[in-house]
């Protein structure tokens, strides 16, 4: 089953999963509470501005995929909840990790551990890495590990509810690291600069090969569960 959710659908699902864990006393959410959660400025990247009409369309799409539903809790006001716990069989720590990735984008295991604590006990860094492995091996995979960015020590993880990312864009290679154009630019470089640039170019080439292999591997895994 491929997700291919829209940005709005991912925001809605992430908010429902977040509020279930972080504020269970107000969960399931009314449409107004869900709008506030989707539009809040803290713990969100990007910040969005959605209307109740947008939310109803997104909830309908999620409902068709078995990821959200309308529920009643004894009152007359319509409330909404997610169905990821049952349909995707996700534990609390797995839902917390996915909620963070949906609401803030790609993050390291350390960032997920720190930020996920507001929703549930995350354990030590090894526990978080094990949770991420389970999500990577889920059928279908729900998370991928991105190639390490140049100059950064830790690798980041990304949810794939919107489908596979364009990995080369995730490398975030700055213009300063790209080779200078033309023979005139090359002639003006000092020898040390040339050596450093060659090493960087080799590293970028290796990264692109790793990206291609990773993309093929993830695509094969997703095809197997399609």
Swiss-Prot record:
Domain of life, source organism: Bacteria
Pfam families referenced in this protein's UniProt entry, alphabetically: DUF480
Family to which the UniProt record says this protein belongs: Belongs to the UPF0502 family.
Record HAMAP family: UPF0502
Name of the protein described by the UniProt record: UPF0502 protein Gbem_0194
Origin species: Citrifermentans bemidjiense (strain ATCC BAA-1014 / DSM 16622 / JCM 12645 / Bem) (Geobacter bemidjiensis)
Lineage of source species: Bacteria, Pseudomonadati, Thermodesulfobacteriota, Desulfuromonadia, Geobacterales
